[in-house]
Amino acid sequence: MEKVCFMITPIGKEGSDVRKNADEVLDYIVNPICKEYGYSVVRADKMANSGLITKAIIEQIITADLVIADLTGNNPNVFYELAIRHSYRKPTIQIVKGEIDIPFDVANMRTISYETTLSGADVAKREIEATLKSIEDGNSVHNPVSEVSTLLNISANSTEENAEVLSTLL
């Protein structure tokens, strides 16, 4: 069974700079490296589903084997979808065009910077590949939600002896 990578990204209107960037990232960075690792890439505007698009998007966010989230433009929909993905503790790769500041809540997570030039796309593909290898090797998923959730679970099952240590971590 083929693995699925869902692409969370600002899409923009047909013909817009936002759409052009989304298409270039998909075609020249994400698709080539994901195909190499056996993933089919799905993006919201390319989905053939009929009915509620939001339902189909959320289903992909939850069930996809991998999500690549493009934080370029600080799009609210992208961050909403990324937060949903975080709550499921599943593999996610964050990317952003250039050296753009990203919001505090996700800034401490590794974010791969990309450019849509030939050399920039090659650099981004190598970095995504390194992250994909780590995911394929079974390394655990870390994000702000999973970290706090783990600590809360430990805290709920802790003894009085280690409660003080846990309180400093929370």
Regions found by a protein language model. Give the residues of each.
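Cross-kingdom TIR/SEFIR domain
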Residues: G73-S134
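TIR-domain catalytic/interaction hotspot
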Residues: N31, V42-A69, G73-E81
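C-terminal interaction surface of TIR/SEFIR-family domains
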Residues: T111-L170
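Conserved N-terminal substructure of TIR/SEFIR domains
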Residues: M1-M47
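Flexible, glycine-rich phosphate/dinucleotide-binding loops
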Residues: E14, S50, D101
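Flexible, glycine- and charge-enriched loops at secondary-structure boundaries
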Residues: R19-D23, T54, A121
